[in-house]
Swiss-Prot record:
Signal sequence, renumbered to the chain: none
Principal location listed in the UniProt entry: secreted
Post-translational modification: The natural peptide is not C-terminally amidated. However, amidated synthetic analogs show a much more potent activity in all the biological assays.
Cellular compartment(s): Secreted; Target cell membrane
Role noted for this protein: Linear cationic alpha-helical peptide that acts as antimicrobial peptide. Has antibacterial activity against the Gram-positive bacteria S.aureus CCT 6538 (MIC=40 uM), S.saprophyticus (MIC=40 um), B.subtilis CCT 2471 (MIC=40 uM), and B.thuringiensis (MIC=40 uM), and against the Gram-negative bacteria E.coli ATCC 25922 (MIC=80), E.coli CCT 1371 (MIC=160), K.pneumonia ATCC 13883 (MIC=80), and A.faecalis ATCC 8750 (MIC=40). Has antifungal activity against C.albicans (MIC=40 uM). At high concentrations exhibits activity in stimulating degranulation from rat peritoneal mast cells.
Organism: Oreumenes decoratus (Potter wasp)
Single GO BP term: defense response to protozoan
Tissue-specific expression: Expressed by the venom gland.
Keywords: Antibiotic, Antimicrobial, Cytolysis, Fungicide, Mast cell degranulation, Membrane, Secreted, Target cell membrane, Target membrane
Protein name, as recorded: Decoralin
Membrane-spanning intervals of the chain: none
Gene Ontology cellular component terms for the protein in this record: extracellular region; membrane; other organism cell membrane
Length: 11
């Protein structure tokens, strides 16, 4: 999901 992608970028 989008959240997962965003989280990945943040982490």
């Amino acid at each position: 999901s989008l959240l997962s992608l965003i989280r990945k970028l943040i982490t």
